């Protein structure tokens, strides 16, 4: 969970009230956080957040805003945000090239002027940058933030691609380095360059005079990308692969700088094609949708008897604009710096926090039940223990993936796979129908580790099913991969026999026609004359698609069928 370190004096100054340590500890609980340590000597407080959905709280400005709003009940306003029907004047432009749109598509920015950066302010900004990029940004893969002195930048800015031979002087270095050299030798390149695996073009941020701002999300340039104490005019940009996450991150930083005393000047981003919010977006941009909440639903879940007016007042203590037109419903508008309202229940939780947990009496459950594992979970655990006992290491993968990994590299038509409508990124456009592509992808990036490699996963897969009412069917599958130059069909056949022996299940095999396997070295697994899975040596063609140079054997089997 995210941990931040902030100056206590700055926090209290922004709150506008001298709270005792006890009062501070109590009110910080409303942010789903707790104080780990109070360092009186260095004037610092260490806070751990128990929720990753509130990145707006990971700074002294954001936390102070939350506490101040909770105490006053006044919803903060930010008049520099654009909306669909109310676009702000912009003071700079960013042009996105079609080439970079397919690599790391989204970038937004704004200008901040009017304050002098002191040491503590700069430290707070750098910490926010790191927390947003690392925690919320999934180690810069989802989003990453860059900060610059705008005095050195000539607008408009161009967000383009470059080859691995392109050179500039990166931050922390005194000599020019190519993109390839940065990826291999610069500390940030070594840490984050895996974001750009299997690409031959890289993202680059240039100003109008072709000065390099940064190689996002890896490293800024030394000449323009150095922010220091005494700077007054800032340019902030956020790049990412998720449109809403990128917009939200920029909004959070804009609100923080505004609360620090900066004047926020919007910047327009122009994309090569339409996005969910248009081809041109002036940022900071308010994109969140309102929610309609039923009063009875709130009271039923909380065991309360609150009116719509009561609920609206409680929500305003958390910075949420709320109003009602009828006594049985009300509407909320999420704050510009939040996007964690996915369901009515999320709003009900906020009502409870706004009312105060101490105002709800605890009750013992009226019904007594005993929980237990489902049969499929018990069986899965048995299979998992057997795999670990046979020397395999368990993996856990996402259920979503790309067309490239699930279809093209596997050399299948993919007609049975389920696709996601309007995916935000090509990396998550299909629901997996097999675990094997994930195992092969892991093997493709593991060539530097000693062989043999033996990995497995027990997880869900989904396929189209025209017979069922939903049109889909979900299975629990076991899949494993063995990689070594000595492995062959005999080794995996022996392992399959051992697995079924310990499960006390009889099985038969017949030659498989799947193009996943080398001809004559793949087999279907039949239990009670029903095909439940397959195993064999992976075809060199498919191994080459994944960039794997070592022979691999794989198995995948439906464990629902084994249990039945």
From Swiss-Prot:
The keyword Transferase belongs to this UniProt entry's keyword annotation: no
Main location: cytoplasm
CDD domains hit by this protein: PheRS_beta_core
Cystine residue pairs: none
Pfam families: B5 (PF03484), tRNA_synthFbeta (PF17759)
One annotated GO biological process: phenylalanyl-tRNA aminoacylation
Subunit text: Tetramer of two alpha and two beta subunits.
Matching PANTHER family: PHENYLALANINE--TRNA LIGASE BETA SUBUNIT (PTHR10947:SF0), PHENYLALANYL-TRNA SYNTHETASE BETA CHAIN AND LEUCINE-RICH REPEAT-CONTAINING PROTEIN 47 (PTHR10947)
Name of this protein: Phenylalanine--tRNA ligase beta subunit
Protein encoded by which gene: pheT
């Amino acid at each position: 969970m995210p941990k931040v370190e902030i100056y206590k004096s700055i926090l209290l100054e922004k709150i506008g009230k001298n709270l005792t340590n006890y009062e501070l500890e109590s009110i910080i609980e409303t942010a789903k956080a707790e104080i780990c340590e109070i360092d009186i000597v260095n004037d610092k407080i260490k806070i751990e957040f128990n929720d990753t959905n509130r990145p707006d709280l990971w700074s002294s400005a954001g936390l102070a805003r939350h506490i101040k709003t909770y105490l006053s009940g006044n919803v903060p306003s930010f008049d520099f945000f654009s909306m669909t029907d109310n676009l702000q004047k912009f003071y700079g432009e960013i042009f996105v090239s079609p080439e970079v749109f397919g690599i790391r598509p989204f970038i937004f920015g704004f200008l901040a002027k009017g304050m002098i950066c002191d040491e503590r302010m700069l430290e707070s900004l750098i910490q926010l940058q790191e927390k947003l990029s690392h925690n919320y940004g999934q180690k810069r893969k989802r989003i990453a933030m860059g900060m610059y002195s705008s005095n050195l930048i000539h607008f408009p800015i161009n967000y383009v691609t470059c080859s691995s031979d392109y050179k500039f002087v990166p931050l922390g270095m005194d000599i020019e380095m190519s993109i390839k050299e940065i990826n291999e030798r610069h500390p940030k390149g070594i840490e984050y360059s895996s974001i750009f695996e299997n690409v031959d073009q890289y993202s680059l941020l240039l100003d109008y005079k072709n000065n390099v701002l940064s190689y996002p999300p890896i490293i800024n340039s030394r000449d323009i990308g150095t922010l220091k104490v005494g700077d007054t005019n800032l340019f902030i940009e956020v790049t990412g692969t998720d449109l809403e996450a990128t917009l939200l991150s920029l909004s959070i930083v804009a609100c923080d700088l505004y609360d620090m005393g900066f004047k926020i000047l919007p910047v327009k981003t122009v994309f090569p094609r339409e996005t969910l919010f248009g081809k041109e977006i002036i940022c900071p941009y308010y994109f969140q949708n309102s929610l309609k909440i039923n009063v009875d639903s709130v009271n039923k879940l909380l065991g309360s008897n609150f009116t719509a007016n009561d609920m609206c007042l409680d929500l305003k203590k958390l910075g949420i604009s709320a109003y009602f037109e009828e006594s049985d419903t009300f509407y909320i508008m999420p704050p510009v710096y939040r996007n964690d309202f996915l369901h009515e229940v999320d709003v009900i939780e906020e009502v409870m926090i706004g009312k105060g947990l101490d105002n709800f009496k605890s009750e013992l459950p009226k019904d007594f039940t005993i929980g237990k594992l489902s049969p499929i979970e018990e069986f899965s655990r048995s299979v998992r223990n057997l795999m670990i006992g046979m020397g395999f290491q368990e993996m856990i993968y996402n259920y979503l993936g790309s067309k490239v990994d699930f279809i093209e590299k596997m050399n299948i038509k993919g007609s049975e796979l389920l696709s996601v409508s309007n995916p935000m990124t090509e990396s998550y456009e299909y629901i997996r129908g097999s675990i094997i592509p994930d195992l092969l992808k892991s093997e493709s990036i593991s060539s530097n580790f000693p062989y043999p490699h033996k990995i497995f996963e027990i997880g869900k897969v989904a396929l189209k099913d025209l017979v069922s009412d939903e049109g889909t069917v979900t299975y629990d599958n076991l899949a494993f991969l063995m990689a070594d130059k000595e492995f062959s069909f005999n080794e995996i056949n022996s392992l399959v026999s051992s697995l079924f022996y310990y499960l006390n299940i009889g099985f038969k095999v017949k030659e498989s026609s799947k193009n996943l396997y080398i001809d004559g070295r793949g087999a279907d697994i039949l239990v009670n004359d029903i095909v439940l899975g397959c195993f064999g040596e992976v075809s060199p063609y498919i191994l080459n698609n994944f960039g794997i140079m070592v022979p691999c054997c794989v198995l995948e089997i439906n464990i629902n069928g084994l249990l039945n």
